A protein has these predicted regions:
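Bacterial N-terminal signal peptides that target proteins for export
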Residues: 1-6
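N-terminal membrane-targeting/anchoring regions of envelope/secretory proteins
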Residues: 8-10
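N-terminal signal peptide c-region/cleavage motif recognized by signal peptidases
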Residues: 12-15
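Transmembrane beta-barrel domains of Gram-negative outer membranes and organellar outer membranes
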Residues: 18-229
């Protein structure tokens, strides 16, 4: 009984823990990176929102510009709830090249698992999303739209949606923002990405606000990412 209660609380803390492409928290990009051929990347970020804290490490392997596999390992801490771990496996396939067509679209499938502190690993949800990306501002910016559906364990399906935008404003500096919503809550997130070494090493500084039926709060998001490893 206690394990079931702990799992329920941890699942409620997972609002907007959908699969995503950095620097976003929810949104997937459908912009194919033409130089990503059999390369690794590692993205890491820390999130703070109200009583909740989390640290994520996410290695990704790009088979080619159109196909990639990412695994996210996340440690969650909640001063008012249950601590635990989360694991997400995500496969993304893109159907075209944005550099050629000016737009891109694809499909993302993900499996989520959780382990409350002291409990076993349990499947928490499966999801499917359709990302669409559009080049704007003569190629210096991107607009993203995601529509999807998630099936939490022992619950009804939840439809999800996200909008995001990014644009390079200075050399090596990109501003980004995203808005997401499902039937239980909303997310607002925005910040700046700075490339220490262009296309190889980046740091992110952002702010987020989360509002759901179970909790609400705001806080910082700090990230660092290595690409083309």
């Amino acid at each position: 009984m206690l394990r079931c209660l702990a799992l329920t609380v941890l699942l409620s803390c997972m609002s907007f823990a959908w699969c995503a492409d950095r620097p976003y928290l929810v949104t997937n990009s459908a912009a194919a990176e033409e130089d990503e051929e059999q390369v690794w990347s590692v993205e890491n970020w820390y999130r703070s929102a109200g009583a909740q804290r989390s640290l994520t490490v996410a290695p990704e392997y790009a088979f080619d510009p159109l196909n990639s596999l990412q695994v996210e390992f996340r440690r969650t801490l909640d001063r008012e709830g249950v601590n635990g771990h989360e694991l997400e496996v995500e496969y993304k396939h893109l159907f075209n090249h944005i550099a050629r067509d000016g737009y891109g679209w694809g499909v993302v499938a993900a499996l989520d698992m959780v382990r409350p502190q002291g409990g076993p690993w349990t499947r928490s949800a499966v999801s499917l999303a359709l990302p669409f990306s559009l080049q704007v501002a003569e190629g210096s910016g991107l607009l993203h739209l995601n529509l999807g559906v998630s099936k939490p364990r022992d619950e009804r399906r939840v439809f999800t949606g996200a909008l995001a935008a990014e644009r390079e404003v200075f050399r090596r500096t990109t501003l980004f923002a995203e808005w997401a919503r499902d039937e239980d809550g909303r997310l607002l997130h925005g910040g700046v990405r700075y490339w220490i070494k262009r296309e190889t090493l980046a740091v992110d500084l952002a702010w987020q606000r989360v509002r759901s039926d179970d909790s609400r709060g705001s806080g910082v998001v700090l990230g660092i990412a290595w690409y083309d490893l």
